[in-house]
Structure formats: structure tokens, C-alpha cells
Amino acid sequence: MKNIKDICLVVAARLGSHRVPQKMIAPFANTTLLDIAMKKLIGSKVVPKENIILAAHEPQLIDIGEKYGISVYRRSGESSRSEGKELTVLYDWHDKLDFKYVVLLNPCLPFLSIEIIDEFFLAYANSKDNGLFGVIAKKNYFWNSEGDLITKWVDGLEIMN
């Protein structure tokens, strides 16, 4: 069992994505992905607001965190541009926070509910393990090089999922 006071929830955000540049502040459903994540988190019934940290470098992202009263860890420019080759650069905050444990939330998941986030946070707090990973069951279909379906088709389905 871990003390909730020892666990922070970090949202790492940046504007330099190569696949979708500026996706954290791009218009999405009359708001932004980062705004959605911040609004959700401040509504948590489990995670204390003082345990929520936005790790960001760019002023536009920092402004969003501050708008919601979220603590901001100011990432280095190098960290915000990193593509994950060196994890110590990408996660430059990992040894600079005053918490024993970190739950990392990807803000690119606008449909992830606060109830699921709270449930995961509690599951981690109540586990004796140092790490925990969120996974979902998903049915995937695979074909061989000749184009033949090699995954067993689910009986009764006319279309995929």
C-alpha cells in the first residue's frame, strides 16, 4: 500500500509532435486536448489537486495548466523536442519531483473518463508493486502475405468489431 500523498499524476505535454504538430492546443471539440485533460483531473475524487503536475516547456501549455490551478514543472526545451531515444531526456522531471511515485497520464486520450483515471490511481496506490500498466482487451485481425485472414473470425459477426 502506498500513501496517496506520495503519488503524483504527471501530464507530459509538448507542441513539437512530428505526426500532429501542436496537437495539445489544436481545436478539438470546441476546446483542446490539454484543456480536456486538465478539466477532468481537477474533477478527480481521488487525486489531490496538489498532486497533479503538468510537465511542459512551451508558454501556451504552461498557461493552460495555470488556468486550472495545476502545478507546472517546466521541462527543458531539449525534453520537449525529444522523440524518446533517451528516456532521461524525455522524462527530465523523473528525479526532480517531491513524490516517491508517479502515475503518467497521456493527454491524447480525450475519451478516458475521470472514473477510470481514479480507479487506476487507487489500484496503483493499493498495490504492493512499484509499477502498473493500464491495458484494454482488443480484438485485432491479421492477414498473411497472400491476403488470407489468419485470425479466427468471431462467430455471428458480419463486420469487424
Feature map (PLM): residue ranges:
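N-terminal nucleotide-binding beta1-loop-alpha1 segment
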Residues: M1-P21
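Glycine-rich phosphate-binding loop signature in dinucleotide/nucleotide-binding domains
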Residues: N3-I4, H94-K100, A125-S127
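Hydrophobic targeting segments
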Residues: D6-V11, L34, L41, N51-L54
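Histidine-centered beta-alpha loop that forms part of the nucleotide-sugar donor binding/catalytic region
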Residues: R14, G77, N106, I136-A137
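Short, well-formed alpha-helical segments that are part of the catalytic scaffolds
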Residues: V20-G43
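Short phosphate-binding loop-to-helix
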Residues: G43-V46, I53, P59-V103, F111-E115, ...
